[in-house]
Amino acid sequence: METNKLYECTVIIDGGLQDEPIAEAMAMVQKVITEKGGSIKSVLDIGRRKTAYPINKKTIGYYAHIEFTADTPVIAEIERVLRYEDVLLRYLIIHLTTPLLEMRKRVEKYSVVIGSPEDKAAAEAEASEEEKK
């Protein structure tokens, strides 16, 4: 019996598009996930960013992360549909395992905006105390 697993889908949409086609592309990705039997947990729109290298001669992409749960066979169906969408420059679906989730919690815990040297020293002291445990 398959149980739903937690996945993360990162998509890069053509950043040269206007806001409306980008919103439609995001809605399409979410619709594909839910139609194929997935359940969306969260959506994080990162926004337009410069890509590390040109993708299909485009250097600006609109980045988004979608966390969802689904059965393992559903992932192949989702990828099959996303593969043929022209507005998506890239997509990647990964299974979020326990070590990845623990690492994410640690990164979120220590990723504070450090404004003053005192804040930086306090964050470093807290990190060293955690490492000693």
Swiss-Prot record:
CDD domains associated with the record: bS6
Gene Ontology biological process terms, A to Z: translation
Pfam families: Ribosomal_S6 (PF01250)
Keyword entries, A-Z: Ribonucleoprotein, Ribosomal protein, RNA-binding, rRNA-binding
Top-rank taxon: Bacteria
GO molecular-function term, one example from the UniProt record: structural constituent of ribosome
Gene3D superfamilies reported in the protein's UniProt record: 3.30.70.60
Single GO cellular component term: ribonucleoprotein complex
Function according to Swiss-Prot or TrEMBL: Binds together with bS18 to 16S ribosomal RNA.
Family: Belongs to the bacterial ribosomal protein bS6 family.
Protein name (record): Small ribosomal subunit protein bS6
Species per Swiss-Prot/TrEMBL record: Chlorobium phaeovibrioides (strain DSM 265 / 1930) (Prosthecochloris vibrioformis (strain DSM 265))
